[in-house]
């Protein structure tokens, strides 16, 4: 029997916070981008497309497999698909630098997958909902979701790039401050979720924690070995593994609030946001030791 999900009052505060914070984070991403981050793809297309393929196709497939094998509750399963559909976050660029990975490739992957997310994310999420028997009745179509995402994802990125183009020297000198601000915005979103659902959050984490841990670790390992076979070197391997393990959690929360009202749909994102930093730094430590 299909479940019917409609927008309600339960997530009212996070629905206000998430789009504002996401728009500011994407503006910050745009401030750090230039045309060369896109044209660079032409100089090493194989490295880019291995990362692109791993993130947009392999990651959702692995997430679906985890959801089915663990027989997750429907909201948790769909929440897992939402975080898998999300593009890489700005954090992946920072951790790639710590890992001595290919930062330029990381930035290009983040930029392109973020801009394409207005198409890829609604497609994956809506089809996942249909697969798990959830009927979305929010009076919003896939096109409507894409348009709303464009307002808080694509438009801020483009504005940020325009601002950088007009004042490149000034923006370049302040980019570290911008990155710190976006980091705090990310924290604000997840603090709001924890505060809003403080009575239930640990029950939710108990349901989602194992699933997101398996997804995160298995995907970084899979991506690392796919990259090992196809890309040009170890720095590119590190980059692609981290891109597939560090997702844009704020975007995932925004999509969850746009389509669903139950907090359970946000929980995998909240759990993933905690776990991905721990596993990410452990992964970097292992890479450094192996070097």
What do these predicted regions represent?
Residues 1-291:
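Alpha-helical transmembrane segments of multi-pass small-molecule/ion transporters
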């Amino acid at each position: 029997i299909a479940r019917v999900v409609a927008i309600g009052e339960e997530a009212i505060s996070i629905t206000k916070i998430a789009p504002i914070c996401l728009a500011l984070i994407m503006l910050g991403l745009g401030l750090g981008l230039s045309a060369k981050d896109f044209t660079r793809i032409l100089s090493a297309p194989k490295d880019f497309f291995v990362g692109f393929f791993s993130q947009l196709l392999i990651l959702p497939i692995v997430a679906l497999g985890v959801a089915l094998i663990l027989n997750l509750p429907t909201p948790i399963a769909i929440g897992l698909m939402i975080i898998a559909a999300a593009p890489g976050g700005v954090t992946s660029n920072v951790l790639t630098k710590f890992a001595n990975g290919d930062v330029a490739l990381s930035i290009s992957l983040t930029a392109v997958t973020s801009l394409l997310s207005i198409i890829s994310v609604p497609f994956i999420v809506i089809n996942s909902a249909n697969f798990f028997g959830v009927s979305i009745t929010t009076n919003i179509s896939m096109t409507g979701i894409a348009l709303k995402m464009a307002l808080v994802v694509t438009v801020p990125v483009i504005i940020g790039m325009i601002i950088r183009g007009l004042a490149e020297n000034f923006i370049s000198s302040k980019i570290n401050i911008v990155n710190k601000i976006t980091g705090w915005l990310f924290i604000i979103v997840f603090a709001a979720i924890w505060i809003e659902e403080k009575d239930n959050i640990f029950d939710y984490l108990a349901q989602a924690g194992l699933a997101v841990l398996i997804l995160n670790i298995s995907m970084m390992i899979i991506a690392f070995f796919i990259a090992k076979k196809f890309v040009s070197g170890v720095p590119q391997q590190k980059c692609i593994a981290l891109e597939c393990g560090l997702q844009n959690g704020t975007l995932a929360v925004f999509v969850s609030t746009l389509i669903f009202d139950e907090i359970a749909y946000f929980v995998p994102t909240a759990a993933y946001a905690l776990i991905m930093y721990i596993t990410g730094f452990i992964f970097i430590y292992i890479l450094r030791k192996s070097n």
